[in-house]
């Protein structure tokens, strides 16, 4: 597990491109037969990827968390961004097709990931601290109804799927979902916003090899950008905007954790407030 320490926005103003990338970009989440994890000191979230091959991968952080097992004091949200796979929780197995979600509550000791029938599943997960155990629950993308947002003039027509949240799958503090941009649309989260009460992470998906997303971050009057490829994720501190424009349309998995559990709790930034 790799540590990602919190950084003050005054320090970020002076970062080079490589410093920005080393603190905020997670560019190697999916290595076959490996569990990859990043521990962010922004609201103590763990962000990771599991790419099981012929054998199961167990959700295990060794002694990093100083607990007897990973979910002893944590909850976790999982999405399969690869081919069909399964997540075993104790004696129960949950088959996840592409872009299906699974929430697992605090206290579940044995969790493992596997691919099915020679396929190559890829599981992306975000874990946050928890104080109560909520039931394990699966959400199939095919059974969800998205919010349709945006317009052609702003090049941001998209489908927003809220999965783990106050009015969906219940959790302690974790919120998670996916946004999918229509073809010929490339902007997300613009006009921008911040939410000083919680952090956020974006995993960018459905990009061709030569396509990129320019992810905008930083304080509204001190913006910076990261060039992000397919299946790469970005950490967004509470003080930072999080927006992007792609060279093609794309999808992104968003996840939040922190003080407030209300999805609409955000501070909008007017366009003339960006620099």
Curated annotation (Swiss-Prot):
The keyword Metal-binding applies. Keywords: Isomerase, Metal-binding, Zinc. One of its GO terms (molecular function) is zinc ion binding. It catalyses: 5-dehydro-4-deoxy-D-glucuronate = 3-deoxy-D-glycero-2,5-hexodiulosonate. Induction: Induced by galacturonate and negatively regulated by the KdgR repressor. Is subject to catabolite repression by glucose involving the ccpA gene. Transmembrane segments: none annotated. InterPro entries: KduI, KduI/IolB_isomerase, KduI_N, RmlC-like_jellyroll, RmlC_Cupin_sf. GO terms for biological process: D-galacturonate catabolic process; D-glucuronate catabolic process; pectin catabolic process. HAMAP family: KduI (MF_00687). Catalyzes the isomerization of 5-dehydro-4-deoxy-D-glucuronate to 3-deoxy-D-glycero-2,5-hexodiulosonate. This is 4-deoxy-L-threo-5-hexosulose-uronate ketol-isomerase. The gene is kduI.
